């Protein structure tokens, strides 16, 4: 990968000049000038996903200049480097190959001269065999009963991805009840175990190192709870499996290493749902549906890897994001799925984006002089409309939004879905085109109210519009289309990281807090006052000790 400061490129300078022209351009003008604007600024993936980016403050010239930026930053070269197994995660000296986990073509993928695909396929086969035994009831607990509940214990990428996908694909789930425990707060594991029976519960301990503090604290509490009923430590092997690479620690815990599902250091946590970390997904929806999830992602990988920039959906979305982040000065992006099953999608990509591109040091080790990753947030529609859309419509912040919805609902009750979708379509129209003072006055007149006497209210009913959105319409949320959608966002994040000239696949920002917590933990014992920190931290710790 080439290290290029984007602000030193000719394309960046051209974009700054172009922004001076575009900053006050209104979308309603762009639409009136081009009746076929939708056709120009939309793309369809595999007859499954329509991406409409026409409601953005862009012209073809904008996209051309953004694509010139991608070319100067050698995004195409970076894509080749990632897919070919080069160690592009330089600070950890690792390849970045979550794409190999879903490589349905089985073409060789080389890391250090070795094809990783045989190992990938072996773990997938192991997941298939194990999941079929559990789902069928062949796998028995210590009293001979079949498993009814599965508890995934992990944190970060070992939790967010599997939880998001199992929720998004609930229409495909089987009889097993899934639970996810992540927080080291004892409430999380305690409340989960209240719903479970030790005779019929299977625990998945998801930790690459098997030393993650939060995960292992919860795992030991789960084991204690289990043994309080089962008594015999030998029974742990029937109720606990490991998603890990540390066989020594797994064995010490009491898990049979035959029930350890491996993954590799070239799989980043926030990109790991495609690996053994996805075992909870397989147990929830079955292996065939998991394969469809992989296939959808693989299809998007192929699109991303082989499609020219002007038709490359992740590339287009990434460049539009940079346009707002680095030229309009927006600080956040909202992800707004109009599908209740997708209620964890924004949280998943909050980690996916912010942990990947929340960096202020570039690939040369220098502090950047430009904005990098945006703040990501969002909630399902229509709930958000009655919560925070007020600020999106009439606030002083410009917030680009992704609206996501399926054309076909898994629950076609009465006219629920039509009402949901009418809101989906209405919101992007309202954000783009707004409502003028003239329209407000006309509404007063048609309601028999005198606009002159109602004038004091009128300013509050005006919507400026010109708020940018992408509309992402799926035919239906299936394992295949969800896989493609997730991969689309993953590659968008990657492209932005390349252009920002940062390392997208490490996460050193999580380390300092963990180190300090390990130092503070022993200080919380006993009653003696603590004075080894700053005055704020000392007094917070001492008040905690006094009150507990």
Curated annotation (Swiss-Prot):
Q: Where in the cell is it found?
A: Cytoplasm
This entry carries the following GO cellular component terms, namely: cytosol
Q: Under which EC number(s) is this enzyme classified?
A: 5.3.1.9
Q: A Gene Ontology MF term for this entry?
A: carbohydrate derivative binding
Q: Does the record's keyword annotation contain Heme? A: no
GO terms for biological process, alphabetical: gluconeogenesis; glucose 6-phosphate metabolic process; glycolytic process
The UniProt keyword set, sorted, is: Cytoplasm, Gluconeogenesis, Glycolysis, Isomerase
Q: Name the pathway it acts in.
A: Carbohydrate biosynthesis; gluconeogenesis; Carbohydrate degradation; glycolysis; D-glyceraldehyde 3-phosphate and glycerone phosphate from D-glucose: step 2/4
Has keyword Coiled coil? no
User: What's the catalysed reaction?
Assistant: alpha-D-glucose 6-phosphate = beta-D-fructose 6-phosphate
> Which positions are catalytic residues?
355, 386, 514
Q: Mind telling me which InterPro entries this protein's record contains?
A: G6P_Isomerase, G6P_Isomerase_C, Phosphoglucose_isomerase_CS, SIS_dom_sf, SIS_PGI_1, SIS_PGI_2
| Stated family | Belongs to the GPI family.
| Purpose | Catalyzes the reversible isomerization of glucose-6-phosphate to fructose-6-phosphate.
Which protein, by its recorded name, is this? Glucose-6-phosphate isomerase
Organism in which the protein naturally occurs = Proteus mirabilis (strain HI4320)
